[in-house]
Amino acid sequence: KIAIMPSPNNPTGNCFRPKDVEEILSRFNGIVVVDEAYAEYSDNPFVSRVEEFDNLVVLRTFSKAYAMAALRVGYAVSNKKLADMMICVKIPYSLNMISEGAAIAAVKDQDFVKRSVQMVREQRPILDSGLRKLGFETFPSDSNFILARSPIDHKVLVDGLKQRGVLIRDFGAKRRTENCIRTTVGTAEHNALLLEKAEEVISGCR
């Protein structure tokens, strides 16, 4: 049996509490996979604790903080016993040479990752505050995006922003994220543009 826990979660952006993950690890009779695709933006990664639990596997990716989504590079971290088991079932040649070379080069450029993550951490509360001032209900985020419930119809907002050259993700028709949108935390200039155009769309509905 395998239980998969995305932390930070997508699309909510929040992390599981460490004590909740620990409880699941201790009580679940199977392998617990914690997907930490967005972990660089959070404060509670579990990747350093794989030796504490005999049933923990942590997944990481180069698609987010390393900005290499097109190359489809990721990896798993676990204790040796689980790693040996995964190697037995891993498909051969799962990574091409171009992606492998790019990943090695990316690992050596930690300055880029640090700058990227720092920018998100600085801009995230600023964008969150700006959205709330426009009437959005924002959800706490440990990631590089913010989920927010729109003060107007989600389709009107998404379409209005698209007409103004701004693209956001629409989650408004999904269960439990009714009337919600998700926006990436960008640079100060990008975030200011989003807020400006969102205010235009919202004002046009009132």
Please place each PLM-identified region on the residue numbering:
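Conserved PLP-binding catalytic core of the aspartate aminotransferase-like
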Residues: V120, R132-R164
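Active-site pre-lysine segment of PLP-dependent enzymes
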Residues: P11-A65
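PLP-dependent aminotransferase class I/II
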Residues: N55-R132, F136-F139
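Structural motif
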Residues: I2-P6, V33, Y75-V77
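Short acidic/glycine-enriched loop/turn segments that link adjacent beta-strands
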Residues: A70, D142-S143, R175-N179
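Short beta-strand-to-loop capping motifs
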Residues: S78, A148-I152, V185-T187
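PLP-dependent enzyme catalytic core of the Aspartate aminotransferase-like
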Residues: K19, Q163-R164, A173-R206
